[in-house]
From Swiss-Prot:
This is Uracil phosphoribosyltransferase. Its cofactor is Mg(2+). Keywords: Allosteric enzyme, Glycosyltransferase, GTP-binding, Magnesium, Nucleotide-binding, Transferase. Its EC number is 2.4.2.9. One of its GO terms (molecular function) is magnesium ion binding. CDD domains: PRTases_typeI. It comes from the Bacteria. It catalyses: UMP + diphosphate = 5-phospho-alpha-D-ribose 1-diphosphate + uracil. One of its GO terms (cellular component) is cytosol. The lineage of its organism: Bacteria, Pseudomonadati, Aquificota, Aquificia, Aquificales.
Amino acid sequence: MIVELSHPLIKHKVNTARIQDTSAEKLRKTLKELGFMLVYEALKDILLEEKEVRTWIGNKRFNYLNEEEIVFVPILRAGLSFLEGALQVVPNAKVGFLGIKRNEETLESHIYYSRLPELKGKIVVILDPMLATGGTLEVALREILKHSPLKVKSVHAIAAPEGLKRIEEKFKEVEIFVGNVDERLNDKGYIIPGLGDIGDRLYAVSVY
């Protein structure tokens, strides 16, 4: 399932991130805010659990989120920009990390680092600002699905139609939430118009 979110504030922040001379500091702040908004939307269907609590008029039962059932998995490096915002939505969620690198010649991706908590029966939310060819997300999903999660969601600021099609065809059970579906990929596998090299831009590694 693919959901392109229509909220005007999400569109505004995605387009703010496109501006070439946006400082690294402002870009990190913008992506943190996008992480909050996208995760908030992605968890709209989550089920609550009844719990008895003490109130000013005695013990009462209300519905609450079991935060420990949720696991955020940012894709290094750029996915870290979403993590702080995601944890503001669900502060007690568990966090795992996947480092996945794409070969810029073959466009194939491979895992170079994996540190995941228990995923069996959990709701996993993958955090990655961009979904381009879908190669990185495919590798992440294959790794995560080995551990029998209850549900997997993936959130992105932008995505290319080609990558969305690839993931939807191979992983029909995965829910993808995206701030904006961009035009296309270029011959190097970059999203057009995209965000440039978001990892480098976030951490002021280079100017493109």
